[in-house]
Amino acid sequence: MKFAAKSAIIKLMKIAIASDLFWPMINGISVFSKNLAEQMTARGHEVVVFAPSQTGDYYVEEVDDYRVVRLSSTNFPFYPNQTETLPEPRKIAGGRITVPRIYLHNGYRLSLLPIREIRKFCKENNFMPDVSHIQLQLFVGQAMIDFSRRHNIPVVITNHSSPENLFDNLKMLAPLSPIINRTVLLYTKRFALQADYATMPTQQAIERHFRNPEKAKMPIKAVSNGIDLSRFTPEKPPKEFFEKFDLPQNLPIVMNIGRVDAEKHISTLILAVNEVLKNNKKAQLVIVGDGTDRPNLENLVYKLGISKNVRFMGTQLGEDLVNFHRAATVFVSASPTETQGIVFLEAAACGKPVIGVDVGAVKEICQDGINGFLCETDNIEQIAESISKILDNKQLAADFSKNGLEIIKQHDLNFTISKFEEIYNFVIEKKKQEPRNWLEKLSRKLKK
């Protein structure tokens, strides 16, 4: 990880980061929160992350010179975590009967009543934040807002999620998903109104949540999630990488990286690749990640008879993750629910053409005809055609790669961290000018 120098005009701060999802969970929110904590610490700020415990019990851990307060949690069994592969189906009656996958024992951890433990840590460790940064609109986030309001601490809220990310995996709620999604959209908007400053990864995400963002009571700005451009670079993976994962070095690879869950519409991508294979039998689809939909997708691949052309690689981290991006001929996501999509940033930084869905914020990274193609949601033929155009035209792929490397320069993680430093400084100074209690408010009114 590249550590940027601290800006001379920014004072050192005590920063509380509250996230109901944090490492070792693997998704966009946890990755961003981890990057934020690491980079702010590297610039000299004191950072404490408040997140659900991975064991269920309260504890505090030191991670790369910052602390993570693990708040007492309970298992949310209807949604799997992304720290490991899915558990094997449970079998009974001597292995003759497979128990339906009604729920998964390694689900998300939820901290339902975290406020007392937040107070406890801050009191025992003499930690009073200068600013609180909320990453998700759930229990830990709301508790940190309540704590901050009580102690007159400014609050910054970043909204990373689309409603579909939360509920489209729960098939039992599928008939109600339109109503639920609208309700959640309203909830996330009202949640953000508790902030002194709100951010979202892209302008499109802001416009989806706020009809007139400029009229909101607090500033609302687009700040990219950013990625470390010193880590994700357009190099060829070493020979050892291909051998380790038994990947072909000279065949076209269609790459998909991320959560393998229903709202990512990976089944659409598989069906599109099935069409591509009718004219390009050497194409390979490589799916990196795990999630609730993997068993269904593996079954779909088997039924289509394309198991030799589709590889499920499971969750990959570190340099292996970077090399999977580098090994791709083209990166493709059929997901219509991205607020930005860190994987699009990573792929573009590795010099890969990208294909996405023309919905929401993806178009800021995947620019149609510039560094890739945008397709209609679940349009299998259009996605297949877009993949084939890139696989069949090396010059087009090279042009898209070059253009993508220019686009990605705007999303350097250093710029993102500097922007949040400025935002923190702004809300801290603004909070100092506000009356602390009703007596100060009354006094100021009387002086007018």
Across the structure, where does each feature detected by a protein language model lie?
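Nucleotide-activated donor-binding/catalytic signature segment of Leloir-type glycosyltransferases, i.e.
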Residues: N296-Q316
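Short alpha-helical donor nucleotide-sugar binding micro-motif in glycosyltransferases
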Residues: A192, T315-Q316, N323-A328
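N-terminal subdomain of nucleotide-sugar transferases
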Residues: I9-S72, N414, E421, N425, ...
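Conserved acidic donor-binding segment of nucleotide-sugar-dependent glycosyltransferases
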Residues: D368-G369, F373-I380, K389-Q395, K409
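Conserved donor-binding/catalytic core segment of Leloir-type glycosyltransferases
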Residues: T199, P248-K264, I270-V273
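Short hydrophobic beta-strand element within catalytic cores of glycosyltransferases
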Residues: P353-G356, C366
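Carbohydrate-associated surface elements
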Residues: S53, Q204, G226
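Aromatic "clamp/platform" in nucleotide-sugar-dependent glycosyltransferases that forms part
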Residues: P336
